[in-house]
Every structure is written in structure tokens, then in C-alpha cells.
Amino acid sequence: MQNFDKTAVIDAANALPGRLTPMPVATLHVVNGHSMTHVPEGMEVAIFAMGCFWGVERLFWQQPGVYSTAAGYSGGYTPNPTYHEVCSGRTAHAEVVRVVFDPAIISYKQLLQIFWENHDPAQGMRQGGDVGTQYRSAIYVLTPEQETQAQESQALFQQAMTKAGDSRAITSEIAAALPFYYAEDDHQQYLYKNPQGYCGLGGIGVCMPPNL
């Protein structure tokens, strides 16, 4: 047990069992007052992992056309995990942000550009000083169209990195979305509630080519 590697994704057989009861979630987003759970007609959902979800959630709630955001966990096996369990590396979940957006105002392609340009997608199971599988970079897609656009955007950003002299390979996971589990209320809109709180978010200085 002492030799457990938090940078290796655990398999389902060894993941924590979790629980049947969902995490209680606030009714309204504290920044904009919108519903934390409802997706209004005509709006769409995106799920991104870019390291610690505190800064990621703030990045997206600041975007015009984003209706609501929520910090949570996805990509793993443990149902309804706690933050402590996710940090143990024994759930296989990543820290993610669920973004509800109006595609008439901000497109999924624009959200992808924000994703690629605002973190380091070539660090594997870490993001800066935050180390562990929960900090991996990932795009969890909900439709075939999202998958196609995510794959195309990754190829373009890889080209942009190479052109900028960064020879590393992108390690971001692109996969079909598994169940999204809300994080504890303390983590929702964390940097609004704690303006001086930790934010490890930062890009690598590479811009997405304009033909995304």
C-alpha cells in the first residue's frame, strides 16, 4: 500500500467502492445565479479537465455565453466520490468542470481553444506542481460531433506546439464522457468564495491556429 503510484490510473477492480448517495449540490451558481443542474433548452454541455478544478471553473464562468459551471469528478470508476477519495488516486477520476453553454454565443470550438491555450496539455498525470491522476488533462465528449472537433483541435494544437519549438507530445485524454459527479459545495465557485485561493492554471504560450 505504501508503494501506491498516484500517477498511474487504477483499474476498476481496485477502485474504491464509493456510495449510492449523490453529493448534495447547491441549487444556484453563486456567481451568476443560474441553476447548477438544469440545462435550458438549446444549450449544450462540455466537460474539461485541466488540473485543479478551482481555476478551471473560474476560467469558464468568465466566458460570455457560458450559462453555468460546476466542479466535479469524471473519467473514473468510483460512484459519488469525495474529494479525499479522488485525491487518493484510488477512484481513477479526474477533477473536471462541467460547462453549460449557449452555442449561439460561444461555440464548442471556442471552448476547445480556451481549453488548449490555458493549461499545459503535455504533462501526463500532473499539472505544474499538482501531481496525480486527478490532475490529468482531458476532454470528455458527449456527442460524436464533440469528439470530431476535439480530435481535430488536438491535431492543430500539436502542430502549433511543434511550430513554436515545443517537441513534446500532447497527453490529453479524449474519451466519451462517463458519469459526472458533483464535487462538494466547498469546491463550487471556489475562487469566487475565496478570491485569494490557489490557482495553478496557466498556459504554455502557444496559440491555437485561427483555422480551428
From Swiss-Prot:
Substrates-to-products reaction catalysed: L-methionyl-[protein] + [thioredoxin]-disulfide + H2O = L-methionyl-(S)-S-oxide-[protein] + [thioredoxin]-dithiol; [thioredoxin]-disulfide + L-methionine + H2O = L-methionine (S)-S-oxide + [thioredoxin]-dithiol
UniProt cross-references to InterPro entries, sorted A to Z: Met_Sox_Rdtase_MsrA_dom, Met_Sox_Rdtase_MsrA_sf, MsrA_MetSO_reductase
Keywords, ordered alphabetically: Oxidoreductase
Gene Ontology, cellular component aspect: cytoplasm
Coiled-coil ranges (or none): none
One Pfam family here: PMSR
EC number(s) given by UniProt: 1.8.4.11
GO molecular function, one term: L-methionine-(S)-S-oxide reductase activity
Alphabetized HAMAP family for the sequence: MsrA
Functional note: Has an important function as a repair enzyme for proteins that have been inactivated by oxidation. Catalyzes the reversible oxidation-reduction of methionine sulfoxide in proteins to methionine.
Protein name: Peptide methionine sulfoxide reductase MsrA
Gene: msrA
